[in-house]
Amino acid sequence: MKMRIQIFFILSLFSSISFASVQDFCVADPKGPQNPSGYSCKNPDQVTENDFAFSGLGKAGNTSNVIKAAVTPAFAPAFAGLNGLDVSLARLDLAGGGVIPLHTHPGASEVLVVIQGTICAGFISSANKVYLKTLSRGDSMVFPQGLLHFQLNSGKGPALAFVAFGSSSPGLQILPFALFANDLPSELVEATTFLSDEEVKKLKGVLGGTN
C-alpha cells in the first residue's frame, strides 16, 4: 500500500510539470488549440530567434483615455517564446492622474518596478486588509495572485513602470469595467454594490455599459 502511494505521488508530480520543462521550450502556435497550461507548441523546425524576442515595450502607450493609462503586454502568443515558461511582462504608462483601476490576475502573481515618477500602489487581502505603498523610481512591490490591486500616478508628471508575472498568460479582470462596461442590468448592479440608480447609470455612461 505504501509503495502504491509513493508511485501515485511520483506520477502526480510528473503530470504537474509543464510541457516546456519536458522539452527546451514550447513556442506558442496561435493557430493551434489553447488549454489551461498554455498554447500548443509550434513545430520546432519553424521556430526562429524572433520567437524569443519582443520589441513592443520601448514605446510609450496611448494614455488618452478615461483612465489616463496604458498597458503594453508581452504575453503569449504575441511573445511566442514565453509559452509554457511561467513568465511574462508588461509596460505601464500613467499620465498625470492616471490609474490602473482595481483589478486581478487570476493566473499569476505580479512584481512591479517603477522606472519614472511616483506611483501609489496597493492590494487588498482576502481578509479585506489593505496594503498600501507610495513607490518612487527604483522601488518595487509584489501583488499576490488573484488579489485586487491597483496603481495610481500620485506624482506631478508622467509615471512609467514595468511589471513581471509568474505566467505567460496571467489573465486580467478590471473591476470597474466588469461592473459597468457591459450589459449587466443596472438593477442587479445596484443591488450587489449598494450604489444608487443615478450612480450606476453615470458609471455605465462613462465606461460604455448598457441596460
From Swiss-Prot:
Compartments where found:
Secreted, Extracellular space, Apoplast; Secreted, Cell wall
Positions glycosylated per UniProt: 62
Q: Which CDD domains match?
A: cupin_OxOx (cd02241)
Which Cys pairs does UniProt list as disulfide-bonded?
26-41
Q: What is its main location?
A: secreted
Q: Give the record's GO CC terms.
A: apoplast
Q: What does this protein do?
A: May be involved in the maturation of walls of growing cells.
Quote the subunit structure annotation. Answer: Oligomer (believed to be a pentamer but probably hexamer).
The name this protein goes by in its record: Germin-like protein 1
Q: Which organism is it from?
A: Sinapis alba
